[in-house]
UniProtKB/Swiss-Prot annotation:
UniProt keyword Metal-binding, yes or no: yes
Record keywords: Lignin biosynthesis, Metal-binding, NADP, Oxidoreductase, Zinc
Cofactor note: Binds 2 Zn(2+) ions per subunit.
This enzyme's EC code(s): 1.1.1.195
GO annotation (BP), single: lignin biosynthetic process
Cofactor(s) for this UniProt protein: Zn(2+)
GO terms of molecular function: cinnamyl-alcohol dehydrogenase activity; coniferyl-alcohol dehydrogenase activity; metal ion binding
Species assigned in the record: Pseudotsuga menziesii (Douglas-fir)
Protein name from the UniProt record: Probable cinnamyl alcohol dehydrogenase 2
Family the UniProt entry places it in: Belongs to the zinc-containing alcohol dehydrogenase family.
Pathway listed: Aromatic compound metabolism; phenylpropanoid biosynthesis
Keyword NADP: yes
Role played: Involved in lignin biosynthesis. Catalyzes the final step specific for the production of lignin monomers, like coniferyl alcohol, sinapyl alcohol and 4-coumaryl alcohol.
Length: 41
C-alpha cells in the first residue's frame, strides 16, 4: 500500500491503516509537521 502526499487525506489514510511511514522531503519543516502529527519519523 502506498500513499503519495501526507497533507489532509494522506495523513488520515496513514493513521487509518496504521502504516509505517517513510518521509522524503527537502524541507525540515515537513519533518516537524510529521512529528506533530504523532507519526513515526
Amino acid at each position: 500500500c502506498g500513499i503519495l502526499g501526507l497533507g489532509g487525506v494522506g495523513h488520515m489514510g496513514v493513521k487509518a491503516f496504521g502504516l509505517h511511514v517513510t518521509v522524503i522531503s527537502s524541507s525540515d519543516k515537513f519533518v516537524v509537521d510529521v512529528a506533530a502529527s504523532n507519526l513515526d519519523k
